[in-house]
């Protein structure tokens, strides 16, 4: 008889679970022992040689990962033993697996579950790189029971908060992670085991410094920290911020002759700034069957170049990617470019680090990178995993020498190539035509120009970035703009100062700057930086003349002769300016208040008579402009006066001051005070009595009106018949006047015609109703039917 396939008995099931648990414990202890016995100095070639758990090994095999790269072979062993690591390797060398495998293995050996909380935190500088790391984690960790999450900006914060407490592994960007640490109440990181920083040098620089410091402040100090990047930092301050404990520095290609992959061909082109767009267009037209990434320094440039080339239709799909786009759009563009065989992607540095776009043929750097590390990360988007790739760098003649020195220091081999003149196509006329027809494109061009100049201006390496040597007018023309937009932050010759400077001032300043031999200084001293507080303390009233003007006039108000000034300056002592006159007033024999109008007119000064007694002296252009504004002239006019008229029609001012003699003639001040108080007391008492009498009369009239209304209501209710007032007969006209006087007074209003209602339908007014129930009145019998109904009721 065949064995039964039914459910096992309780005893057999319990024993099988016990055996399974025991077997798992034995496997875990064996794995732990293998990790402890691992020889770090030995070089391993495949993942099967490493002490990995069964779920991790199965995930690697399913994802077709078999052979170890150099960084993986040297870093995974240290990480499995729980040491802190600083990992540095070339781009495309497999650094992602070098930290994801230790994360899975360390949590697996500790039998981590969702009840233990967050076990590993992986920080990435960009959203796209975080998404890529999360996808790799899903592939190799598909057989594990850990819960992993992706925390980036652009997603719903509330949905992330609901699921965050159940996560064991988190891949995130610094900004969003700090937001959850500060705002999510149920999110705890006290039990964190591992902290991983991918592209650590970028995360630790000034852009993320405060954010990373705040995140590290929330984390426990007893943890394992892994730092990986193509250009690793060794600064003691950065390592101290992360509380690294005796870190192991793993640099695979430190002794290599090149910091970039050997399969990468690197070239640079020296082209003026105004010809970069023409060279880029010619390159794209010559490589329509290639996959290219073009790096620019700002998002405004990316948008302008993308929109311009899209209108020109080069014959290849164009895409653009920058940080101002929505997260959904960024993901779509990343996926489309990864799947495309032939395309051009215009991008900022958000795609320069870590992203793995398959089969990229060219990397074009239209703008010079800020340093050699940025250059290495940009060109690392091609020639990945031992594949071929090519990179081209566009340099302005002023940037060539400085940038080549920086690349040489980083062991970057690069060669110069020249462009054939017959292959280059100019698109300047087309861009000018498009900017003329499309105001939005012109606006984008202006913003692109400003953002590029600003990006050059803020660079620290002034040996490479020399803003004054760039031909900005030609660059603006190459963008299709009619002229270079004004940029406020560029320091140069102040046109306003040169416009307002007078010849005499320039002559005096030239004499002051000349040395004893008579030779003038060729260059003025650079001005020191003046803050807003300096300007606040240097501020003076507008009616005080400037120092240079006070030096041009003599004590008598006449202008200084320049020839005499030059000769006198030679004999003057250096300390003559110790007690210098700030402003001179023309004081004569009269009062110091000012000169008469005749004297001012003789000196050529214009005097304007305003409404009233005041006069306005026009001695400057500011005063001339003042005459055009009525509002500003009000402060120079006298205050208006208000007149009142007495009963006799005489005009008096609103407030007239009494003469002191008249006041004394009326007696002592205290007697006047007492008399005034008595008069005012009597006046107020009389007025109070009058007010009380008026109030009493009003109350009496109100009471009489109320009683009259009540009488009228009673008279209307007692009326038994319908009464209509009709016009009088002719005989009534014969009544005598005496009879009319005896009649009742005529009402003020015309009486309305009222018809009395029958008694059956009349209701008793509310004030006449009794609280006791009224007896029912007998019904009146009017017809035979009423009599019959009454008899029927009595009999029945």
Swiss-Prot record:
Q: What is its EC number?
A: 3.6.4.13
The subcellular localization recorded is: Nucleus, Nucleolus
InterPro entries per record: DEAD/DEAH_box_helicase_dom, Helicase_ATP-bd, Helicase_C-like, P-loop_NTPase, RNA-helicase_DEAD-box_CS, RNA_helicase_DEAD_Q_motif, SPB4-like_CTE
Task: Report the transmembrane regions from the record.
Answer: none
Query: Which GO biological process entries does UniProt record here?
Result: rRNA processing
* Catalyzed reactions per annotation: ATP + H2O = ADP + phosphate + H(+)
Biased-composition ranges, Basic and acidic residues, are 517-533, 663-696, 737-746, 754-767
Q: What cellular-component terms does GO give this entry?
A: nucleolus; small-subunit processome
Chain span(s) of sequence motif DEAD box: 198-201
Q: Motif Q motif in this chain: where?
A: 45-73
What's its job? ATP-dependent RNA helicase required for ribosome biogenesis. Involved in the release of U14 snoRNA in pre-ribosomal complexes. Required for pre-rRNA cleavage at site A2.
- Stated name of the protein: ATP-dependent RNA helicase dbp4
Protein encoded by which gene: dbp4
């Amino acid at each position: 008889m065949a064995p039964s396939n039914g459910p096992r008995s309780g005893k057999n099931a319990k024993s099988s679970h016990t055996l399974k648990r025991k077997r798992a414990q034995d496997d875990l202890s064996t794995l732990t022992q293998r990790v402890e016995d691992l020889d770090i100095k030995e070089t391993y070639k495949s993942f099967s040689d490493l002490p990995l758990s069964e779920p991790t090994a199965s995930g690697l095999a399913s994802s077709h990962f078999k052979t170890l790269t150099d960084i993986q072979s040297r870093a995974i062993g240290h990480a499995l033993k729980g040491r802190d690591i600083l990992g540095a390797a070339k781009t495309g060398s497999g650094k992602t697996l070098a930290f994801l495998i230790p994360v899975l293995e360390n949590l697996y050996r500790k039998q981590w579950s969702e009840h233990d909380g967050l076990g590993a935190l992986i920080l990435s500088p960009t959203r796209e790189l975080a998404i890529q790391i999360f996808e790799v984690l899903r592939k190799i960790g598909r057989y594990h029971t850990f819960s992993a999450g992706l925390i980036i900006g652009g997603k719903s914060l509330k949905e992330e908060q609901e699921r965050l407490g159940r996560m064991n592994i988190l891949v995130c960007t610094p900004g969003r992670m700090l937001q959850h640490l500060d705002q999510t109440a149920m999110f705890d990181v006290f039990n964190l085991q591992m902290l991983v920083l991918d592209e650590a040098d970028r995360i630790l620089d000034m852009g993320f410094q405060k954010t990373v410091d705040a995140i590290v402040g929330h984390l426990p100090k007893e943890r394992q920290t892994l730092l990986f990047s193509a250009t690793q930092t060794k600064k003691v301050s950065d390592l101290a911020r992360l509380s690294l404990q005796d870190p192991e520095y793993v640099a695979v290609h430190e002794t290599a002759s090149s910091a970039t992959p050997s399969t990468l061909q690197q070239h640079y082109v020296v082209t003026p700034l105004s010809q970069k767009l023409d060279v880029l267009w010619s390159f794209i037209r010559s490589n329509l069957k290639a996959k290219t990434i073009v790096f620019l320094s700002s998002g405004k440039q990316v948008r302008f170049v993308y929109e311009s080339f899209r209108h020109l239709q080069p014959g290849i799909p164009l895409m653009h990617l920058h940080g101002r786009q929505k997260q959904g759009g960024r993901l779509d563009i990343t996926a489309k470019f990864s799947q495309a065989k032939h395309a051009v992607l215009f991008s900022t540095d958000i795609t320069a680090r870590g992203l793995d776009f398959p089969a990229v043929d060219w990397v074009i750097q239209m703008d010079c990178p800020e340093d050699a590390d940025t250059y290495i990360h940009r060109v690392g988007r091609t020639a990945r995993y031992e594949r071929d790739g090519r990179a081209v760098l566009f340099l302005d003649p002023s940037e060539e020498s400085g940038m080549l020195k920086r690349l040489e220091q980083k062991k970057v081999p690069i060669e110069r190539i020249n462009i054939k003149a017959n292959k280059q196509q100019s698109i300047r006329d087309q861009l000018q035509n498009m900017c003329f027809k499309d105001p939005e494109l012109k606006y984008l061009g202006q913003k692109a120009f400003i953002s590029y100049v600003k990006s050059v201006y803020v660079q620290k390496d002034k040996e490479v970035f020399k803003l004054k040597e760039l031909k900005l007018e030609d660059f603006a023309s190459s963008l299709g703009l009619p002229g270079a937009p004004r940029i406020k932050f560029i320091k140069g010759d102040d046109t306003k100062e040169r416009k307002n400077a007078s010849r005499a001032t320039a002559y005096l300043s030239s004499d002051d700057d000349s040395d004893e031999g008579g030779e003038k200084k060729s260059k003025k001293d650079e001005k020191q930086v003046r803050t807003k507080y300096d300007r606040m303390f240097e501020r003076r009233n507008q009616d005080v003349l400037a120092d240079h003007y006070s030096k041009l006039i003599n004590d008598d108000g006449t202008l200084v002769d320049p020839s005499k000034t030059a000769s006198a300056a030679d004999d003057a002592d250096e300390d003559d300016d110790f007690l210098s006159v700030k402003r001179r007033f023309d004081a004569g024999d009269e009062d110091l208040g000012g000169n008469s109008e005749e004297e001012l007119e003789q000196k050529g000064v214009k005097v304007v008579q305003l409404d009233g007694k005041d006069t306005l002296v026009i001695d400057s252009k500011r005063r001339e402009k003042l005459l055009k504004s009525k509002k500003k002239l009000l402060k120079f006019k006298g205050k208006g006066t208000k007149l009142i008229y007495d009963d006799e029609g005489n005009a008096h001012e609103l407030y007239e001051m009494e003469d002191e003699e008249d006041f004394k003639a009326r007696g002592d001040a205290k007697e006047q005070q007492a008399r005034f108080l008595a008069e005012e007391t009597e006046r107020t008492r009389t007025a109070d009595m009058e007010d009380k009498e008026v109030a009493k009369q009003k109350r009496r009239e109100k009471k009489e009106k109320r009683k009259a209304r009540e009488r009228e209501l009673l008279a209307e209710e007692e009326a038994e018949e319908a009464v209509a007032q009709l016009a009088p007969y002719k005989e009534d006209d014969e009544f005598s006047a005496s009879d009319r006087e005896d009649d009742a007074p005529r009402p003020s209003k015309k009486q309305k015609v009222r018809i009395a209602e029958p008694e059956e339908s009349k209701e008793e007014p509310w004030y006449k109703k009794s609280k006791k129930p009224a007896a029912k009145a007998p019904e009146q019998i009017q017809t035979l039917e009423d009599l019959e109904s009454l008899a029927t009721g009595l009999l029945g």
